[in-house]
């Protein structure tokens, strides 16, 4: 009888920490990539993404928001949740297992960009478009 391996949940956020201690918390793009490579996508049950992973992303969102605003990624010096999203989709394109992803970012524009990217991949591959924006209880 083979024991079922533990499935992990990855929580990407540079500031917040989820109340539920079952999440594996990563704070940056580099940590995100390292942890997923270490654990393996086949052992991950769920990924929750933040968009703004540093000061310049936060400033771009807070000070640039106007009607019909689009994020100018040229103004952001650190990698964002969008970079993590693109990396993740590239893993799927390379044949790695597709896992469920949600977005918990307060940045509505960044969230929309990530959700669109993820759900477009799923749509093009005839999968359920189940990537949604959620609120996860956190300590900060």
PLM region spans:
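Catalytic phosphate/metal-binding cores of nucleic-acid and nucleotide-processing enzymes, i.e., regions
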Residues: 1-140
């Amino acid at each position: 009888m083979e024991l079922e391996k533990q499935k992990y949940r990855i929580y990407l956020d540079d500031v917040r920490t989820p109340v539920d201690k079952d999440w594996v918390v990563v704070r940056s793009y580099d940590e995100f990539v390292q942890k997923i490579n270490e654990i393996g996508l086949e052992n991950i049950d769920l990924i929750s993404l933040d968009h703004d992973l540093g000061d310049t992303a936060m400033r771009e969102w807070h000070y640039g928001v106007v009607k019909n605003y689009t994020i100018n990624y040229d103004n952001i010096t650190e990698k964002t949740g969008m970079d993590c999203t693109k990396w993740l989709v590239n893993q799927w394109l390379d044949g790695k297992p597709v896992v469920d992803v949600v977005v918990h970012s307060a940045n509505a524009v960044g969230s929309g960009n990530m959700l669109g990217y993820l759900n477009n991949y799923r749509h093009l591959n005839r999968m359920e478009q189940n990537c949604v924006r959620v609120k996860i209880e956190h300590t900060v």
